[in-house]
């Protein structure tokens, strides 16, 4: 009986080959982060999230700079981090944005859609802290672009 207890205690206290405690890899991604962020894409957490009466026509060119995805508006000589509709995806291999309805947009693509300009505190209220934290890291000025939360809210400029 004592031998069995010793074996169980030894197995429970198992360490790596150098005697250090075993490190079990875990993910620091929270459920909110998984819903709100995909690579550089910040998005509404779900399709039922309200986007209010965002009616301003926004246009510009997509630009990736590090982990930040921007809408560059040359007419204003500014760029803005973007909040996309829920279910928008980042295709890392091709470095493209894929909208919920399947439209693929590459970096350098001229895009347009309905939305508005918002402060980072508004991003937190609309889509949560994870997206707000990324937006804060990406700010060049004091605002972000938030598109309507509908699958067809933004697409290539026609």
Give the ranges of each region predicted by the language model.
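C-terminal motif of bacterial Sec signal peptides marking the signal peptidase cleavage site
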Residues: 7-11
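Bacterial signal peptide processing site
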Residues: 13-16
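Post-signal peptide N-terminal segment of mature Sec-exported envelope proteins
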Residues: 20-44
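Short, surface-exposed binding/anchoring microloops in extracellular/periplasmic proteins
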Residues: 40-79
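A short macromolecule-binding patch
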Residues: 77-87
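Flexible glycine-rich surface loops and low-complexity tracts that mediate binding to linear polymers
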Residues: 98-136
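Short peripheral tails and domain-boundary helices/loops at the edges of structured domains
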Residues: 128-158
């Amino acid at each position: 009986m004592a031998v069995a207890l010793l074996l169980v205690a030894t197995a429970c206290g198992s360490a790596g080959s150098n005697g250090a405690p075993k490190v079990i890899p875990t993910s620091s991604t929270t459920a909110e982060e998984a819903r709100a962020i995909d690579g550089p894409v910040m998005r509404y957490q779900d399709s039922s999230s309200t986007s209010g009466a965002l009616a301003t026509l926004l246009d510009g060119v997509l630009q990736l700079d590090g982990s930040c995805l921007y809408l560059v508006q040359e007419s204003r000589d500014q760029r803005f981090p973007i909040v996309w509709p829920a279910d928008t995806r980042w295709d890392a291999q091709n470095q493209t944005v894929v909208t919920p309805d399947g439209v693929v947009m590459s970096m350098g693509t001229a895009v347009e859609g309905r939305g508005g300009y918002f402060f980072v505190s508004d991003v937190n209220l609309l889509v949560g802290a994870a997206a707000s934290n990324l937006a804060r890291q990406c700010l060049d000025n004091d605002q972000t672009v938030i598109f309507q939360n509908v699958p067809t809210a933004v697409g290539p400029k026609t």
